Amino acid sequence: MSDHIQKLLPYGYLYLVVLGVVKESIFYYPLDINILKYSSIMDILISPIADLTSYPILILFFIFLGFVLYFFKKYLLKNIDKKSTRKFLKITEDDTSTKDELNQRADTDLIMIFFAMLVCFFLGFGIGGGYKLADRIENGTLNFEKYSQTINFNTGESKEVMVIDHNSIYYFYVEKGKKSIEICPIGSIKSLEKK
């Protein structure tokens, strides 16, 4: 791994933190939940990774995207004399950049493209998912037949619910027949039965 990419890794970590906070906040905004009050910092940090691992096709897509960008970089550096490549890398006629400097420039540009695609994906996922879920709750069109679960509480009470989400501290769910989200601490739940 080049020194340039190693220097960018701390920014990647900071990027992941900010991306997690923004994505979670945007997802829960239409549901009138300030998720930062109900989450630990670890929940926020791992939320982008948790979303990716929830849908294996997304992992494959981002791995594929990484390979595409890698081979695109190889193509750029191999065809450095082409007008389109020079324009993409912002190389002027009197530019005296070395091959290493051009490699570094290509790395930076392609990493920024990858980060921009991640932002677009997670913002779209947060906005679309949050508003769609809020609409389904409001209209009573949640698919309880397919996704319902039974929560058994420590008190002996049981509820048929659709779990919206959970983190290390709380469960967020909609009880069958209701149109509001309930938030329950994990410690008060004895078991969760999936149907």
Could you describe each region identified by the protein language model?
Residues 12, 20, 66, 124-130, ...:
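Residue-identity detector for glycine
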Residues 27, 61-67, 71-72, 88, ...:
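Phenylalanine-focused residue identity feature
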